[in-house]
Amino acid sequence: APTPATPAAAPASGSESNDYESAVNLVIKEKNYAKAIPAFDTFIASYPNSALQPGAHYWLGQLQLNQGDREQAKAHFLTVAQKYKDSPKRPEAIYKLGVIAKADGDKEKANKFFQLVIKQYPNTSAAQLAQKAMGG
């Protein structure tokens, strides 16, 4: 069931780039993670066809991972990895899926994600992080 929007979330302005930027600013400038999560949720619901969707899912995954909600984080990173194959956020999302699997104690699954990043995106920072995470 969809959760009702909290009053903390700014209403959608009708401009996807403005709404996305406001949500990102809540994270980067204001460090207000409690408000950023509903802001990204609102963005995803308001602009289902936006080119900024993968970024919004990635940010939500990152915020939820930081709060220790690995299940929710995993869902957002999987969305980026599976639905947005051309997104520049995809290698990082796959890497984060590996990090979550490792934290869940599934080293084999973690290494599969890490190897996927290294193989598909060899010259990225995500690949370097994956290499380190595998102990290489």
Please provide the spans of the model-predicted regions.
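Residue at a conserved register position within TPR or TPR-like alpha-solenoid repeats
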Residues: 26-27, 64, 101
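Short solvent-exposed coil/turn linkers within tandem alpha-helical repeat scaffolds
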Residues: 46-52, 82-89, 118-128
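Acidic, proline-/serine-/threonine-rich low-complexity intrinsically disordered segments
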Residues: 1-29, 34-35
